[in-house]
Structures are given as structure tokens and as C-alpha cells.
């Protein structure tokens, strides 16, 4: 779907900030976070207390600018404003995952599971967070293994160390 089609669909009787928000969501969905940030920021500037604008602006900033601190602040604010909206929790969890804070993302998933029960979206997010984590732990295991082998090869025998001390 092109931006022209999205603009055509959303213009009409809706206020401009709602049009900007819908276009921003469409851009975010279609993997254009840089463009989405601009649209979502315009919507946010029109209504700074709208938790939907706040949450999705935070998510788009995380994806486009890797501005983790501000993205987390926005997403956490949206969750505080409307705690019962699962999408705000999912956006916050995604920002934690994008920032590389897997443990925090998993804790937030656990908390959201307590609040929303057995939701399929939470299960999908958990699978993504755990999946992203696997290569990292494999890398760390390999790194630790190589480091221990290097020490064994480089370290002088015990007898030689004793002689060096004397």
C-alpha cells in the first residue's frame, strides 16, 4: 500500500492528527519507521495526552532512531495512562527487546501475562524475544570456551610457575 492510497483513505472528516496517526501506523507496519516517526510526532504534538500517539511514537523512535531512553519513557507513560491496553504493553516489550534488554522484556511479558492471561500475541512476542536471545548466548558460550582454551594453552605448567616464584 502506497502513502498516496493511505492518504486518500484517511482524509475526509477526521481531524488532521488522526490522519497523521493512521498514516504513521501504516508506515510503521510497512517497515518505514523513519517516515512513521515524522507522522506520529505530528499526531503527538496535536494531542500529547493520547496514549496511542505516545506509545506508537515511542515504538517508532526505537525502530528508527534507536533512542532507547526516550522510547522507553514514552511507552511506559502510555502503559501508565491506559494499563488495560495490551498493545501498549507489547510496544514497551518490543522496545526493551530492540534495546537488547532481553531479561527486562521477559519480565514485562510475565507481568503482561498475569494481567491479560493466555493471549496469543504475548506468546508470539515471547517466542521472538527468546529466539533473538539464542544466537547471543551461543556466541557467549563460544567466546567463553575459546577464552578458557587460550588460557590453558598460554599458561605455563605448574612446575614452571613454582620455579618462577623462587
Which stretches of residues belong to each language-model region?
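TPR-adjacent "capping" and linker segments in tetratricopeptide-repeat scaffold/adaptor proteins
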Residues: 2-19, 136
Amino acid at each position: 500500500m502506497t502513502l498516496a492510497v493511505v492518504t486518500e483513505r484517511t482524509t475526509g472528516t477526521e481531524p488532521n492528527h488522526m490522519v497523521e496517526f493512521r498514516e504513521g501506523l501504516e508506515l510503521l507496519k510497512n517497515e518505514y519507521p523513519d517516515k512513521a516517526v515524522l507522522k506520529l510526532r505530528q499526531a503527538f504534538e496535536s494531542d500529547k495526552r493520547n496514549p496511542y500517539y505516545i506509545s506508537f511514537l515511542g515504538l517508532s523512535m526505537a525502530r528508527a532512531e534507536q533512542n532507547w531512553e526516550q522510547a522507553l519513557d514514552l511507552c511506559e507513560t502510555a502503559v501508565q495512562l491506559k494499563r488495560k491496553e495490551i498493545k501498549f504493553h507489547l510496544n514497551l516489550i518490543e522496545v526493551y527487546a530492540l534495546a537488547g534488554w532481553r531479561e527486562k522484556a521477559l519480565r514485562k511479558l510475565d507481568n503482561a501475562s498475569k494481567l491479560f492471561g493466555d493471549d496469543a500475541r504475548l506468546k508470539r512476542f515471547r517466542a521472538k524475544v527468546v529466539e533473538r536471545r539464542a544466537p547471543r548466548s551461543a556466541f557467549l558460550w563460544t567466546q567463553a570456551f575459546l577464552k578458557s582454551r587460550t588460557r590453558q594453552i598460554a599458561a605455563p605448567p605448574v612446575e614452571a610457575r613454582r620455579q618462577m616464584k623462587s
